[in-house]
Regions:
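Generic short beta-strand segments
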Residues: 75-78, 96, 156-159
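Residue-level signal for secondary-structure boundary sites
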Residues: 81, 101-103, 160-164
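Hydrophobic residues positioned within well-ordered beta-strands of beta-sheet architectures
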Residues: 71, 89-93, 150-152
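Short acidic, glycine/tyrosine-flanked loop/strand segments centered on an H-E-D-like triad
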Residues: 86-103
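Acidic, Ser/Thr- and Gly-enriched intrinsically disordered low-complexity segments
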Residues: 36, 58-72, 100-117, 122-123
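Small/polar-rich, solvent-exposed N-terminal microdomains that initiate assembly or binding
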Residues: 1-80
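Short, solvent-exposed beta-strand/turn "edge" segments of beta-rich domains on protein surfaces
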Residues: 81-86, 143-147
Length: 166
């Protein structure tokens, strides 16, 4: 039987996996040129709005103006037509920063390094809530005139064999 009970947990599990990556957290929290490893829990990152599971916008601007860099995890499409047991799920992770914080020392691109951390952390990772996550592509996007970002598109597979709950 098809059930969205586990699917709705996916953004939280993705956020938890990203929170476990100290390098990824350092790019979110530390806007200096050479951020050191930062360790924060997923709940702390959610509470401080470094990671969100819904678009944190109000009139085109992020609610927390002091957040230079943040990540948004969204499930964009849920299709129940794929099979009897499997629910087709795709989504995006947006990572964004303001134009003043894109480059690090030696012209390293903060957002590309963050995208690489997402790719290394999530591609082919097994989620206890809903199968396996696959990163399909990464594309650049301008969020506003002053904010640049990357959209990291993913799909889930093999949900029907997963029964664990978070």
């Amino acid at each position: 039987m098809k059930n969205l009970r586990n699917i709705k947990k996916v953004p939280f599990e993705i956020g938890q996996l990203l929170a476990n990556n100290k390098r990824f957290c350092s790019f979110l929290v530390d806007d200096t040129n050479n951020p050191g490893d930062v360790s924060m829990s997923f709940i702390e990152l959610l509470n401080e709005k470094y990671i969100t599971i819904y678009p944190p916008v109000e009139d085109g601007a992020i609610e927390q103006h002091n957040r230079n860099t943040y990540a948004i995890i969204l499930l964009d499409s849920i299709s129940t037509a794929d099979s009897d047991a499997n629910i087709g799920v795709s989504g995006n992770i947006y990572i964004t920063t303001d134009v003043n914080h894109i480059l690090l020392t030696e012209n390293r691109n903060r957002l590309l390094e963050m995208a690489d951390e997402v790719l290394q952390t999530l591609d082919n990772a097994k989620l206890t809530s809903a199968g396996e996550i696959h990163i399909n592509h990464i594309s650049h996007t301008m969020i506003t005139t002053f904010r640049a970002g990357y959209r990291i598109s993913f799909t889930l597979s093999d949900q029907q064999i997963e029964r664990a709950e978070i």
